[in-house]
C-alpha cells in the first residue's frame, strides 16, 4: 500500500521496498500533469546529494540534466517523505535519506566508465554492478530495451555464475573468448558470484548512465 502525498515514510519503508518508493515518487497526481522526471532521475538525485553533502537546486538541475522546475518538484516530493531537507545553503539528505541511499548502494554497488572496445556500445559507456542481479537475467533483452527507452544506444548484460563471467546468449565464459574484456570488468567492478553488470552506451555520458540505471532497475 502506497502512502498518501505529504506523509513521510518509516525507516522500515526506506530500508525495504525502495523500488516501490521510487515508483511512487514519480507517479502523477491529479489534477496536475505527470512529472517530467523518472525513477532514474530520482536515483541520480539521491546519489548527487549524498556525494555533495549539500547542493543548491540550480547545481542539482545541471547535474541531472533537468529543468529547475522539475527539480523543484522532485525535491518537494523527497522532502514530503522526510528524505531531504532544504535551507538557504541548499538541500541535503536526512538520516532517513542517508539510510535509503545506503540501501540502494547495497544493490547498485558499483559504477565505472568502460573503455574496452569489445564492450563499447557508444561514445560513452557506463557499467553498473547489481548485487544478486544474475538470477533475474535471461538473455539481456529486457535490460537492453529499458536502456534504449532511457535514451541509450544499447546495452549488454553480464553475469558471474560458477566463477565465470558470461554474456547470456553470446558467451558462457568471457574470460576464454575475450580475456582482456573480462579482466577489465573484474578489475573495474569486482563482481561476486550471482552478481550482474549492465553496460550502456550513448553519445552523452549522462544518458549512458541513465540507460544503465534503467537497465539495472529491471534486476532489482
Q: What residue spans do the PLM features occupy?
A:
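Short, intrinsically disordered or compositionally biased N-terminal tails of bacterial proteins
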Residues: 1-21
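Short alpha-helical segments that sit at the start of domains
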Residues: 16-43
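Short amphipathic alpha-helical interface segments
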Residues: 39-55
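Short acidic, hydrophobic short linear motifs in intrinsically disordered regions
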Residues: 53-64
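Short amphipathic alpha-helical interaction segments
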Residues: 65-77
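A short, conserved structural fragment
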Residues: 79-89
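Basic, amphipathic "hinge/linker" alpha-helix immediately C-terminal to the N-terminal HTH DNA-binding motif
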Residues: 89-104
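Mid-protein regulatory/catalytic core that forms ligand/cofactor-binding pockets
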Residues: 119-218
Amino acid at each position: 500500500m502506497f502512502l498518501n502525498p505529504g506523509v513521510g515514510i518509516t525507516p522500515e519503508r526506506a530500508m525495504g521496498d525502495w523500488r516501490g518508493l521510487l515508483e511512487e515518487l514519480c507517479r502523477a497526481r491529479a489534477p496536475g500533469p505527470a512529472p517530467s522526471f523518472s525513477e532514474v532521475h530520482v536515483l541520480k538525485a539521491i546519489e548527487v546529494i549524498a556525494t555533495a553533502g549539500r547542493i543548491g537546486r540550480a547545481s542539482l538541475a545541471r547535474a541531472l540534466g533537468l529543468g529547475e522546475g522539475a527539480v523543484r518538484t522532485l525535491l518537494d516530493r523527497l522532502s514530503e517523505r522526510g528524505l531531504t531537507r532544504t535551507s538557504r545553503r541548499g538541500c541535503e539528505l536526512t538520516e532517513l535519506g542517508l539510510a535509503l541511499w545506503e540501501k540502494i548502494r547495497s544493490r547498485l554497488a558499483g559504477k565505472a566508465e568502460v573503455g574496452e572496445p569489445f564492450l563499447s556500445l557508444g561514445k560513452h559507456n557506463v557499467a553498473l554492478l547489481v548485487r544478486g542481479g544474475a538470477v533475474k537475467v535471461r538473455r539481456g533483452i529486457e535490460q537492453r530495451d529499458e536502456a534504449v527507452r532511457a535514451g541509450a544506444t544499447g546495452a549488454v548484460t553480464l553475469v558471474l555464475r560458477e566463477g565465470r563471467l558470461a554474456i547470456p546468449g553470446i558467451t558462457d565464459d568471457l574470460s576464454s573468448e575475450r580475456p582482456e574484456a573480462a579482466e577489465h570488468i573484474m578489475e573495474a567492478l569486482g563482481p561476486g558470484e550471482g552478481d550482474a553488470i549492465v553496460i550502456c552506451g550513448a553519445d552523452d555520458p549522462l544518458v549512458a548512465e541513465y540507460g544503465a540505471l534503467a537497465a539495472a532497475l529491471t534486476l532489482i
